[in-house]
A protein has these predicted regions:
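Enzymes and membrane/adaptor proteins characterized by extended Gly/Ser/Thr/Asp/Glu-rich
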Residues: 38-157, 185-197, 225-231, 259-263
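N-terminal amphipathic/basic-hydrophobic helices that include classical n-h-c signal peptides
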Residues: 1-4, 256-258
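N-terminal/domain-start segments enriched in small and hydrophobic, helix-friendly residues
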Residues: 29-39, 45-47, 175
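Boundary/entry segment of secreted carbohydrate-active catalytic domains
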Residues: 2-26
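Short secondary-structure boundary/capping segments within folded domains
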Residues: 8-10, 32-35, 62, 70
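Second-shell residues forming the walls of enzyme active-site clefts
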Residues: 19-20, 26, 47-67, 71, ...
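Short, acidic/polar
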Residues: 22-35, 110-121, 207-212
Length: 263
């Protein structure tokens, strides 16, 4: 686990903001924002990447302002891979699920290798974390999740995601499970509107939470789903009471960013 992640964990009792940058380098205004004590992390996007040399320089600029800044990216694989040119193109995790149905042992081995590969490419550039893996089950309902999910079966999910996490750990990267308590059943796109999962919370706990419960000891963070569940509980606005019980260990909680319109 990176030193920046340890610093973030030590400060996690107080809410911290995760910032983003407009372009390929850090502006003077952005340096001031990064230096603010309320800034706990930085998430990078495709707009922040041109090539390895530029990215390394961008990270250096950030570290010059805040050596302990947690630098993150969504580098799951498939359609959610922010850095592509010059990086290994990772498959969607559903490809591992399909492989699992044919050869579970080989699929689990490949999941570990992909997790280590993804993490090692980032840590070599001094990037602390990729927000991965997705632990949402694929019900065939959500186009937002879809092939980002390893599988629709909880046991297969636990096996594959657990191996992926092991691979990340081998490369020195902490894992973040998302989207707690499960985002695969909703249809609405949370980037555009607030999704509603009409199922009772008890059903959610029985069907969607087992991967989070099983893998909780290996997760350093969780990302809540921006859903309304159980007659009005908002998962990322105070409805995380199941998480207080299930994820009973030190854990960063990273909510969805402000620019998602559904929140």
């Amino acid at each position: 686990m990176s030193s920046a992640y340890k610093v973030a964990m030590s400060a996690s009792a107080s809410p911290l903001l995760m910032l983003d940058l407009e372009g390929l380098e850090v502006s003077a205004t952005e340096k001031d924002m990064l230096a603010h004590p309320g800034a706990g992390g930085l998430i990078l996007f495709t707009r922040n990447y041109a090539n390895h040399e530029q990215l390394a320089e961008l990270v250096r600029q950030v570290r010059a302002v805040r050596p302990d800044m947690l630098i993150a990216v969504d580098q799951e694989g498939g359609r959610v891979q922010r850095f592509r040119d010059g990086f290994v193109r990772l498959p969607p995790m559903a490809a591992l699920g399909q492989r699992y149905d044919q050869s579970p042992t080989e699929a689990v081995r490949e999941a570990a290798l992909l997790g280590e590969l993804m993490a090692s490419e980032l840590t070599e550039l001094d990037i602390d974390i990729s927000f991965a893996p997705v632990l949402d089950l694929d019900y065939g309902n959500s186009s937002v999740i879809g092939d980002r999910s390893f599988h629709g079966d909880a046991d297969a999910m636990i096996a594959l995601a657990g191996a992926f996490i092991d691979g990340m750990s081998a490369a020195g990267m902490a894992a973040t499970g998302k989207h707690f308590p499960g985002h695969g059943h909703v249809v609405a796109d949370s980037h555009l509107e607030l999704p509603v999962d009409p199922r009772p919370l008890a059903d959610l706990e029985a069907a969607d939470m087992p991967p989070f419960m099983a893998l909780a000891p290996n997760l350093a963070g969780i990302m809540p789903a921006p859903d309304i569940t159980d007659a009005g509980h908002a998962c990322c606005h105070g409805g995380l009471h199941p998480g207080n019980r299930i994820l009973d260990h030190d854990c960063l909680i990273r909510t969805k960013p402000h620019f998602i319109s559904g929140i």
